[in-house]
Amino acid sequence: PLLVCPTRLLREKKCPLFKRRSFMHELEAYLNYTAGEPVQELYAYLRDETDYPMALIWKNMIRTMHPHDFTRSLALTRIIEPTVLDAVTAESICKNRRIALAMHLYFMDMLDQSKAFAAKFPPETDVFISTSSAEKKPQIEAAFADLNLHSVTVTAVENQGRDVAAFLCDLAPQLKDYDYACFMHDKKAIQTKPGSVGASFGYVCNENVCKNAAHVLNVLCEFEKDPYLGILCPPYPTHGLYFMNMCSGGWGPNFENTKKLMKDLGIDAPVSGEKSPIAPYGSVFWFRPKALAPLFDHGWQHSDFPPEPLPQDGTISHAIERIYPFVAQSAGYYPAVVMSKSYAVTHNDTMQAYASGMIRPLARVFDCTTFYGAENSATGFAYKKHHLFSHYGPYSDSKRRHARNWLRDNLPAGSYKVIINTKRAIFGPHEGPYED
């Protein structure tokens, strides 16, 4: 009950405590018995109806928990409206905060699109642009000359490491004193076939990071109102072959090189190969420069990056793409996903279509037309998943959990601890040190 209906226990039954684990529990476990609302209700109750110091929760979550868990349980994804919601705060930000847009522009045939992206930013924005050759610099300066922006600085940089190297080596040092910043680059993803797949990847990035001018102001307000928010990333692409690759974790061949990079940089944050990093796939994202200071201060050089032709995956650039959220977490901030309101509808319909397509074949094998049949189907699926593949599925925990609870309730504390420690020594924990 402390996990499934904590708010009722606190408000109606006067329970004097709640479980820290509520915020780090996997969302799938809540979905066995609820619609996923318990943690959101608990947080709202503690914030609005008690004097509990919410900073304790935030600091503990950011220090000890994987954001894949607490951002989903607390529904921290930002859905951005296409009209300004808080004009007073937006005006105050533009007057009193320093805003920057960093861009790496390589494809001159996409210059109009890049200009349109920058045109959505408020007039107080400083724009820093890197490009790959001195010949492109005057073209970019001419294109951006008529935009209503505070300043535009264009620099030709070494063409090694593409947008990631340009961002860390040449642009980031200029962003350290800004309050809020956005990074974008002209993205084609030309390695994907057909070309529409790569173009749609770029659409996902730009649509959710900078849909229109009101979207930009609303995003700035999100940072202003949440002092723990460090990064806002667009959702990972789910179309074409991206669906299987990203929904299976998003790591690809990059888990070990990301862990190595974290060690080299001294980044200490919870990381797991079983949990997707909330990372800016495509390297288009919003951030608070303070949150990425541990990465910016490394002193990057273009020689740290492989020369062309750049491998499609598994490079230091791909590790950096995934390390951003962990850098922010080590600095005391958390990452979250940002979506435009219109794309959130598309994303929801897309995932429902995928889910229906995957469940329908199971329904042909198991009787899912009644609750009884659905329960048997879920139990059978979990049994196969656990016993054939040695993996605990979201529906496979009932008997194990009931046995654990019975032992805990009926044995002396010392005996229970010996049994659990013996089990962990032989079989290992299910996932992490808190799981029995």
Model feature map: region roles:
Residues Y395, K399, W406-L407:
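Gram-negative host-targeted secretion-system effectors, predominantly Type III and Type IV
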Residues A291-L292, R424-I426:
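Short Gly/Pro-enriched loop/turn and capping motifs at secondary-structure junctions
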Residues P1-F371, N376-K384, F389-Y392, S396, ...:
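ER/Golgi luminal nucleotide-sugar-dependent glycosyltransferases, focusing on the catalytic module
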Residues A425-E435:
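Structured beta-strand segments within beta-sheet-rich domains
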Residues W406-N410, Y416-A425:
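Short HxH-centered metal-ligating active-site micro-motif
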Residues H386, N421, G428-P429:
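C-terminal functional modules of predominantly eukaryotic multidomain proteins
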